[in-house]
């Protein structure tokens, strides 16, 4: 029954082919074979040499099919033809049965049971990549900026893997639009700033290593909404470890007090006084004098329903002792803004984030690669920059005038940008590309514990330069997929004549 089923399956799948083979042989080979058997002597034709041997006649008749077909219905020949055809058909049927016995129905994934991944070959990668223009991934391999899907790239490479030399710096030459670079050592600025200037770019620098050489960045002047203020206060209070307290209550109260002070300054002071150093000065004044009514008296200038009064309400209710602790906590958090250099850097704004999307601009963000003292400023800087670019795009027909490319080397040093998983998921339509550079995936997970997989998934392109991180290597290995190199089958039979058989593929 199994053999019959195999025969039926073989016929269903190959009926036309089997019939075509039989028909060709029946019309061309069998007539020639029949004529060769009778040696052609029974046929009266000047074209046939009866003295030729069997093989010679067979060759002659096969090479002259039309002559051979002319003898099919010759009475002397037709009987031999039918007999030969009958014998052939029987042999052909037995051959079909044999093939059915050996036939194993092919399956869609035969030979691919464990995977079918492979490296591209013969230029297959150029179905997606370009040879001439776009974001440079490798020699003669560019990621087209107009490709379907996003142009976000995740670059992973350990220390010394060449992340800057082989990826970031080569992409400077493209001049594809505006650029934002994190520059941990300041080397990128030294090597490329003059090139951008020569090509008509506005060059801006946020320099946290040498603040005196930096453009101004005053986050309070960019805070246009309560959400903006929330990001600033949350980042300053929770984005730096001053060792002041382990009790979240004090951080919560310090954050509310800082909100109240920011809202107060924005409502009552001019741009030159609306900065975080002014906040630090007010806190120090109240804390050092022991006169806790200093801040309360300022707040009472404002209407009861003002945002500053609302934020200050819970702080105001604290006991003198608790109020003193709140002031001390906030003073420790704002201590860095009392540094003359940082005070000068954050006093003014000379970087208009929206200009990045309007005209060709390059921004270098230089920070220390040996300590994280000012990393919380980076978090605020990038949060505000990205949000303002998105806002400009949304009010400009849905996209920037100038495409903007972020090359974020040592991305982990920036800290957690609020809602970055949502930003990177919607960047393509706004003509924004994020190129994230890390030493390992562990760094990404440490900062974005709950959303790192979403961020990773929204980078359509992954560039792996090597890493000693097992988790990183394992992730890339699994992402590449598997290939079926071989398959072993073993079958065993029990009872009389017990044995086993193995097949290797």
Give residue spans per PLM region.
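P-loop NTPase motor core of the ASCE superfamily
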Residues: 91, 109, 249-256, 260-263, ...
């Amino acid at each position: 029954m199994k053999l019959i089923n195999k025969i039926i399956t073989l016929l269903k799948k190959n009926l036309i082919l089997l019939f075509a083979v039989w028909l060709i042989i029946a019309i061309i080979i069998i007539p020639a074979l029949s004529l060769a058997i009778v040696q052609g002597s029974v046929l009266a034709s000047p074209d046939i040499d009866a003295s030729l041997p069997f093989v010679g006649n067979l060759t002659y008749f096969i090479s002259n099919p039309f002559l051979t077909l002319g003898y099919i219905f010759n009475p002397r020949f037709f009987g031999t033809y039918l007999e030969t055809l009958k014998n052939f058909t029987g042999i052909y049927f037995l051959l079909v049965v044999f093939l059915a016995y050996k036939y194993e129905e092919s399956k869609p994934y035969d030979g691919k049971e464990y995977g079918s991944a492979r490296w591209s070959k013969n230029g297959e990668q150029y179905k997606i990549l370009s040879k001439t223009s776009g974001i440079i991934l490798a020699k003669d391999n560019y990621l087209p900026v107009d490709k379907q899907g996003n142009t976000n790239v995740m670059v992973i490479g350990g220390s010394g893997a060449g992340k800057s030399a082989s990826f970031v710096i080569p992409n400077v030459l493209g001049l594809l639009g505006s650029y934002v670079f994190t520059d941990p050592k300041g080397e990128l600025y030294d090597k490329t700033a003059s090139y951008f200037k020569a090509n008509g770019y506005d060059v801006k620098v946020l320099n946290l290593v040498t603040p005196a050489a930096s453009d101004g960045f005053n986050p309070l002047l960019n805070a246009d909404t309560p959400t903006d203020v929330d990001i600033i206060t949350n980042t300053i209070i929770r984005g730096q470890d001053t060792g002041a307290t382990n009790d979240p209550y004090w951080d919560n109260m310090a954050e509310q007090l800082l909100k109240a002070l920011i809202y107060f300054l924005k409502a009552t002071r001019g741009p030159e006084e609306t900065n975080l150093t002014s906040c630090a000065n007010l806190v120090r004044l109240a804390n050092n004098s022991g006169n806790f009514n200093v801040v309360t008296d300022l707040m009472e200038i404002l209407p009861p329903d003002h945002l500053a009064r609302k934020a200050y309400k819970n702080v105001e209710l604290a006991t003198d002792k608790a109020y003193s602790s709140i002031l001390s906590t906030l003073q420790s958090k704002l201590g860095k803004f009392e540094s003359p250099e940082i005070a000068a850097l954050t006093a003014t704004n000379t970087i208009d984030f929206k200009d990045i999307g309007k005209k060709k601009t390059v921004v270098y963000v230089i920070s220390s690669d040996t300590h994280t003292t000012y990393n919380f400023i980076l978090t605020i800087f990038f949060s505000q920059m990205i949000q303002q670019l998105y806002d400009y795009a949304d009010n400009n027909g849905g996209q920037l005038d100038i495409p903007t490319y972020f090359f974020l080397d040592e991305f982990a040093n920036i800290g957690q940008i609020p809602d970055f998983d949502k930003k990177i998921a919607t960047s393509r339509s706004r003509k924004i590309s994020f190129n994230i550079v890390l030493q390992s995936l562990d760094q990404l997970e440490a900062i974005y514990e709950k959303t790192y997989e979403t961020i990773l998934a929204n980078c359509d392109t992954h560039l792996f330069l090597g890493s000693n991180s097992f988790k990183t290597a394992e992730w890339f290995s699994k992402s590449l997929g598997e290939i079926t190199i071989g398959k072993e089958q073993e079958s065993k039979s029990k009872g009389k004549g017990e044995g086993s058989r193995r097949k290797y593929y």
